[in-house]
Amino acid sequence: MKFYKYCASGNDFVITNADRKEDRSALAKELCNRYEGIGADGFIVILPHEKYDFEWEFYNNDGSRAAMCGNGSRAAAHFVHHINKINPNMSFLTGAGVIKAKVNQDKVEVSLGKIKSVQNTFEELGKTWQLCNTGVPHLVHFCQNLDEFDTMLCQKMRQKYNANVNFVKILDENHLKVRTYERGVEDETLACGTGMGACFYLAFLNKKVQNKVKITPKSGEEVGFAYKNEELFFEGKVKYCFEANYNFS
C-alpha cells in the first residue's frame, strides 16, 4: 500500500487512495501505532464519489471511526490537490456532511459548515463547561491559566460525555490559546481543528472575541478562524512530510 504522511497544525495523518469502502479499523490502528507502525493521530482513506470531488473514511489513532476532523480535512484537501491533481476549490463528503475547501500552495481553508449544536453551561469537577458540536462533540472550559489542563480530569470528562475536552485561554479579542484532549487518541494532542473551532465559536457566541481570530494550539502553529454567514471557516498551513510503501503485518 502506498501512503503519504501529512502534518497540519501539529496533527499528523497517514493518507492513502482506495477504490472502495471497507472496514479498515485494524489497519488504521496498525498504521497509527507510533512504536510498531508509521505513527499518526489519524488515518485518512480517499475514495471516489459521483457527486463530490471525493469522499473520505477517517479513522482515529485507536482504529475508531470519526465523522469529522478539522486538521484532517485540510490535510486531505492538500493531498487531493497536489497528489491527485484535483481543482484547488473542492467539496468532499465526510461523516459530518459536505466540506468545502480551498488550497493555495501550502495553505488550506475549509468551511466546517454550520455549528451542529450548543448546550448550556454546567459545573462539574470544579470547573464550568459548555458542550459544542462542530462535526464531533467538544467540551470547552475557559480558563485563566492553561497549566490548569489536567489529563486525568480530561479523561474523566471524555468518558462521561463521550466528547473531546478543550481548555481555552482568551489572550485578547483576536487571539486564543487552546489545549485539547482527543477521544480516539485518548491523550492530549498538539492540535485539534474542530476543538479550536468549538472554542472560538463559544467565545464569539459569548461576545468575548471578534468574528475573526488567531488561535495557537499546543504545537505553536498559529491558525485562523472566522465565522461568517453562519459558517465556521478554518485556515492554516499543511505540510507534506513523505511518501512510502507499507507492507501489512
Swiss-Prot record:
Enzyme Commission number, as recorded: 5.1.1.7
SUPFAM superfamilies xref list: Diaminopimelate epimerase-like (SSF54506)
GO biological process, one term: lysine biosynthetic process via diaminopimelate
Active site: C69 (proton donor), C192 (proton acceptor)
Subcellular location field: Cytoplasm
Entry keyword Isomerase: yes
Residues reported in the UniProt entry to bind substrate: N11, N60, G70, N71, N164, E182, R183, G193, T194
Cellular component annotations (GO), alphabetically ordered: cytosol
Signal peptide residues on this chain, from the entry's feature table: none
GO function terms (MF aspect): diaminopimelate epimerase activity
Main location as per UniProt: cytoplasm
Keywords, sorted A to Z: Amino-acid biosynthesis, Cytoplasm, Isomerase, Lysine biosynthesis
Reaction(s) this enzyme catalyzes, per UniProt: (2S,6S)-2,6-diaminopimelate = meso-2,6-diaminopimelate
Name of this protein: Diaminopimelate epimerase
Native source species: Campylobacter jejuni subsp. jejuni serotype O:6 (strain 81116 / NCTC 11828)
Lineage of the organism: Bacteria, Pseudomonadati, Campylobacterota, Epsilonproteobacteria, Campylobacterales
Name of the coding gene: dapF
